[in-house]
Amino acid sequence: MKRFAMILLGCLLAGTSVQAGEPGVKQTIAYVQKLQAASGGFRSHEPKPDAVKILPTLRATSAAVRALKYLGGDVPNQAACVKFVESCWNAEAGAFSDEPKGKPDVFATAVGLMAVTELNLPTEKYAKAALKYLSDNAESFEDIRIAAAGLERLKAKSPQNDRWQGEVKKLQSLDGIFGKELGQARATGGGVVTMLRLGAKYDDSAPILKVLKAGQRQNGGWGKADSETASDLDTTYRVMRCFMMLKARPDNVEGLRSFVAKCRNEDGGYGIAPGQLSSVGGTYFAAIITHWLK
C-alpha cells in the first residue's frame, strides 16, 4: 500500500500543477485538517489512542495553515483557528507564545505573524509591538533567521537590521558561503536567505549555487552535517528556499521529487525524513517544496 501511495504521489509531483481534488493531495489535506483541535489550534502530529494527549501549538497551527494554502485546502474551523492564534498573543510583552498564556519567545512571535497574515487578520494589532520585541530579543543566528522571515510577512524592517546583517556576516566567507563540509549546503541556504531578507545583494550567486547543487545527496534531498547520506525535509526546505530566492533550480529535480515522495506515509502526511512519523511540519515542507517544483 505504501509503495502504491509513493508511486501515485510521484506521478502527481511530476505534473505541472497539483490540484486539491487529486486523490493523493486530497488525502494529505484531510491529514492536516484532522490535526485541528476543538480549541481551533493544530497539533504537531496525530496522537495514538494510548498516548499522552498532544496539545495544539501556535507553531503547528502556523505550519498547518500554510500547508493547507499550498495544498489548496481550507482550514476546517477558521473562526476557532483565529481565536486560538489571538489567544497566544501577549499584549503586555508584545509577542506571541507557542501556547495560550505561555512564555513569549522569538520563534513563536515570528510564526505567529505568519499565521496572522495567512489568516488575513488585521496586522495593526500586532505589527508595532512584535517588531520591537523581535528587534530587542533576536540574538542568535536561528533567532535572526526566523525573525527576518516573520518581518518579511509584515513588509517591515527592524531598526536592528544592520546589526543583524553584521552578526550573520560573521558566519560567512568572502564568497558568500556558510558552514563547512557536509553542513555547508544547509548553512549556506539558511544564511543566504536570511541575508537576502535583510536586504543584502549578491551580485555573483554562482559560488552559492555551486555549493547548493553539490550538496544534493544521492537520495535527492539535502541533509545535516552529521551524515554523508541522510537527508531531511527541513534542510531540503532551507536549500530550496535559497534556490527560489536566487531564481534557480537544483540540477536533479526528479531526484528531489523522489525524495519528497519517500517521506510520505500511508496516512497522507509526511515525516521529516523517510520512515519517520507524519507531522504537520514535515507536511508543510513537502507542500511548499512541491509548489516550488511546479
Where in this protein do the model-derived segments appear?
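Short N-terminal segments immediately surrounding and downstream of signal-peptide cleavage
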Residues: 21-37
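Sec/Tat signal peptide C-region and signal peptidase I cleavage site
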Residues: 16-20
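Bacterial N-terminal signal peptides
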Residues: 6-15
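Positively charged n-region of N-terminal signal peptides that target proteins for export
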Residues: 1-4
